[in-house]
């Protein structure tokens, strides 16, 4: 299930993808802790100030992030790996409009990986303050190399897999 906001309402839709697409996601999306952390409020202070000052570029960046979310939702629903990649790229472009400093610590390390074709797309996870980065690797043959390269720079690979059950609550009678 996922929720999609349309105007003032939220539409709830069931989301079921094939085992093959789920496997592609698990094999191509990698998470890393860069150990580069920020105080989120400080990191975003200039963005909020620009927003309050009416900077139209902030609205443009936020609109791009929204479009990226919609494209990602559509990409997953339609099992389009290219849309998933494009959505992550669009999100990163939107974040860069908000403030290049948000991605700068990661960009310095990941740009060569992107230029060389190892990385298709990447983005700071969440608001970016925690230092975790999601990466879409172009081919699974590069995973080991990417892990080696990034751990040599002090980053930690975070293994993950899709949680098909979600939160399961059970009561135990004592």
How does the language model describe each region?
Residues 125-131:
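Short Gly/Ser/Thr- and Asp/Glu-enriched loop/turn motifs at secondary-structure junctions
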Residues 3-123, 134-174:
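C-terminal nucleotide
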């Amino acid at each position: 299930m996922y929720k999609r906001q349309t105007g003032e309402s939220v539409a709830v839709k069931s989301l079921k993808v094939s085992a093959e697409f789920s496997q592609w996601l698990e094999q191509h999306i990698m998470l890393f802790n860069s150990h580069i952390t920020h105080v989120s409020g400080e990191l975003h202070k200039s963005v909020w100030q620009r927003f309050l000052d009416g900077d139209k570029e902030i609205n443009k960046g936020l609109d791009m992030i929204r479009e990226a979310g919609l494209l990602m939702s559509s990409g997953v629903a339609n099992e389009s790996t290219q849309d998933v990649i494009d959505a992550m790229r669009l999100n990163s472009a939107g974040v860069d409009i908000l403030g290049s400093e948000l991605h700068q610590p990661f960009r310095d390390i990941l740009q060569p990986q992107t230029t060389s074709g190892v990385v298709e797309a990447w983005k700071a996870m969440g608001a970016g303050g925690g230092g975790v980065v999601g990466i879409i690797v172009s081919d699974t043959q590069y995973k080991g190399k990417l892990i080696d390269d990034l751990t040599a720079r002090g980053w930690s690979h975070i293994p993950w897999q899709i949680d098909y059950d979600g939160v399961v609550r059970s009561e135990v009678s004592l």
